[in-house]
Amino acid sequence: MVKVANKYAKALFDVSLDTNNLETINEELTVINEAVKDKIEQLKMVDSNPTQTAEQRRELINGVFTDINPYIKNMMYVLADNRHISLIADVFKAFQSLYNGHYNQDFATIESTYELSQEELVKIVKLVTQQTKLSKVIVDTKINPDLIGGFRVKVGTTVLDGSVRNDLVQLQRKFRRVN
């Protein structure tokens, strides 16, 4: 179903670019995603209900999403018509990926054993932007005592691991190769 969500996201992204609505649509999709992320199971029930017509699903969209961008509403109608309303979170994720790629930015999760100071965060973000060649990094921080010390950064599929735990694991691997 991810491929299907990617197609919806790409179509909406292209329309957003063509109509100079990229920022507005991204903001509205973010709000919609927050509103429905805990309701995916209910949306799956709507999708799979054989007694509900496409018109009834469209009425549901009109009732829930009263004042949204017409391009998003049209996409929601297509999702409803094809019984894919429950894919909205996947569509959002795929749209975010396209949006971030367009602006050469991405989300980064920085894990450390303690709460990092603003100065430390700035240094780490600078390192991450240099390593990944991104123009902007949107940061989420987490405290992870398992790291023992240092930090670990996850950006997409890239992991920059400067933790003591990683150093110990690497050292252990070297010792095993020697024996």
UniProtKB/Swiss-Prot annotation:
Keywords: ATP synthesis, Cell membrane, CF(1), Hydrogen ion transport, Ion transport, Membrane, Transport. Coiled coil: none annotated. GO terms for cellular component: plasma membrane; proton-transporting ATP synthase complex. PROSITE patterns: ATPASE_DELTA (PS00389). It is found in: Cell membrane. It is a peripheral membrane protein. Its main location: membrane. F(1)F(0) ATP synthase produces ATP from ADP in the presence of a proton or sodium gradient. F-type ATPases consist of two structural domains, F(1) containing the extramembraneous catalytic core and F(0) containing the membrane proton channel, linked together by a central stalk and a peripheral stalk. During catalysis, ATP synthesis in the catalytic domain of F(1) is coupled via a rotary mechanism of the central stalk subunits to proton translocation. This protein is part of the stalk that links CF(0) to CF(1). It either transmits conformational changes from CF(0) to CF(1) or is implicated in proton conduction. F-type ATPases have 2 components, F(1) - the catalytic core - and F(0) - the membrane proton channel. F(1) has five subunits: alpha(3), beta(3), gamma(1), delta(1), epsilon(1). F(0) has three main subunits: a(1), b(2) and c(10-14). The alpha and beta chains form an alternating ring which encloses part of the gamma chain. F(1) is attached to F(0) by a central stalk formed by the gamma and epsilon chains, while a peripheral stalk is formed by the delta and b chains. Belongs to the ATPase delta chain family. This is ATP synthase subunit delta. It comes from Staphylococcus aureus (strain MRSA252).
